[in-house]
Amino acid sequence: MLHKNGGLPIAIMDNDHVIAASGMSKREVLERRITKNLEELMENRSVHITTRDVPPMNAIEGLQRKANVVYPIVYGGDVAGAVALMQGDENHIPTETEIKLVQVAAAFLGKQME
C-alpha cells in the first residue's frame, strides 16, 4: 500500500533483518541484515529523514539503495523494527506526505503488535 501511494520502494525490518519489501526485488532484500547505523537508530528510538543537509542512510547491509526516511516500530515501550522509505532510481528528497506515510505505517504496525 505504501509503495502504491508513495511510488517509492519500502522496506520493513525487524531488529535484525528485512522482513518485507515492496517496490524493489524481494530476492534482493529479504532476509538481509540491517546495518549497525540502523540498529543504533532503532535503539535510540530516533528517526532519519534525508534533507539537503542530511544524506540518505545506509540501512541494509550489502544494498546500494539507501533509506530516505526511517521510523522505528515501537510497541509497549519496546522497539520491534523499522519502516524505511528507500531511494528510488533518482536522488529524491522526501516530501512531507511521504514522511507522514512512513510515520503512520510505523505507528500502525506498533499498535497492531500490542
Label the predicted regions.
Residues 1-5, 33-39, 48, 82, ...:
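Juxtadomain coupling helices with adjacent low-complexity linkers
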